[in-house]
Amino acid sequence: MARFFDSRTTIFSPEGRLYQVEYAMEAASQSGTCVGLLAKNGVLLATERSVDKLMDTSIPVPRISWLNENIACCATGNTADGNVLVNQLRMIAQQYQFNFGEMIPCEQLVTNLCDIKQAYTQYGGKRPFGVSFLYMGWDCRFGFQLYQSDPSGNYSGWKATCIGRKSGAAMEMLQKELFSKGYVSPSVEEAKDVAIKVMGMTLGRDSLTPEKLEIAFVQRYGNTTVFHILEKNEIHRLIERNNNLKRRVGS
């Protein structure tokens, strides 16, 4: 009987569960780690980049995607599903700008996509998208914002969060780093150091290299939103700074 409920997207089990949605969320949790931090002067995303010796490194495959001038996102889970939804996000943002002559608010863009993701949990003959997202952005109403969404279509705003592999341990580390002495909103520079610590824990200290990390953040300069993508030498400097701090603490 359990297999009957497993194979039906739209039917609840006797325990009130939608197994296909839970399987989609599990698929998203097995992908590379992505960390998001809301800073007082920006928002930062750091994610694990898949590296293979046989891959052509001259053709980069970015994990962090720009959606419009104010918003970017990172997806974990099924890559093909993620590409489809990123394209959908860009279309929603462009359509809003065409209709209203201004950039779409961050939360509205997240909500619009989550409506689509939720619909796929109740359509017969379809399956949920196996992708979780972190969004970073800015709008004139709420300033800098960080959102997380999952395959069920649920979303929420965060000060710091993590999705993907070892997200539970990463969340504990974020709690320790940011809230152990009372929460104080970090600067972007401080957020970089926290992100490196978390990624070092999820990847392992010996595996933490600039080739395996992608870090980007958004800030405002005057009336312009500016996206920054860290170069490998900048990431290497952050890793070395984190390693030196560990040595001083351990000595």
UniProtKB/Swiss-Prot annotation:
**What PANTHER family would the database entry show?**
PROTEASOME SUBUNIT ALPHA/BETA (PTHR11599)
User: Origin organism of this chain?
Assistant: Drosophila melanogaster
Pfam families, per the entry: Proteasome, Proteasome_A_N
From what superkingdom does this record's organism come?
Answer: Eukaryota
| Role according to the record | The proteasome is a multicatalytic proteinase complex which is characterized by its ability to cleave peptides with Arg, Phe, Tyr, Leu, and Glu adjacent to the leaving group at neutral or slightly basic pH. The proteasome has an ATP-dependent proteolytic activity.
Which key words tag this protein in UniProt? Nucleus, Proteasome
Question: Subunit details for this protein?
Answer: The 26S proteasome consists of a 20S proteasome core and two 19S regulatory subunits. The 20S proteasome core is composed of 28 subunits that are arranged in four stacked rings, resulting in a barrel-shaped structure. The two end rings are each formed by seven alpha subunits, and the two central rings are each formed by seven beta subunits. The catalytic chamber with the active sites is on the inside of the barrel.
Q: What is this protein called?
A: Proteasome subunit alpha type-4-like
Cellular location(s): Nucleus
GO-annotated biological processes: proteasome-mediated ubiquitin-dependent protein catabolic process
What PROSITE patterns does this protein map onto?
Answer: PROTEASOME_ALPHA_1, PROTEASOME_ALPHA_2
Query: Mainly resides where?
Result: nucleus
**Tissue-specific expression:** Testis, prominent after meiosis II. After meiosis, predominantly localized to the haploid spermatid nuclei of the 64-cell cysts, remaining during the elongation and condensation of the spermatid nuclei. In mature, motile sperm, expression is seen exclusively in the sperm head.
* Lineage of origin: Eukaryota, Metazoa, Ecdysozoa, Arthropoda, Hexapoda
Q: Which family does it belong to?
A: Belongs to the peptidase T1A family.
Q: Which interval of the chain is the signal sequence?
A: none
For the keyword Nucleus, the answer is yes
Q: Which GO terms describe its cellular component?
A: cytosol; male germ cell nucleus; nucleus; proteasome core complex, alpha-subunit complex
Q: Which InterPro entries match?
A: Ntn_hydrolases_N (IPR029055), Proteasome_alpha (IPR050115), Proteasome_alpha-type (IPR023332), Proteasome_asu_N (IPR000426), Proteasome_sua/b (IPR001353)
Database matches in SUPFAM superfamilies = N-terminal nucleophile aminohydrolases (Ntn hydrolases)
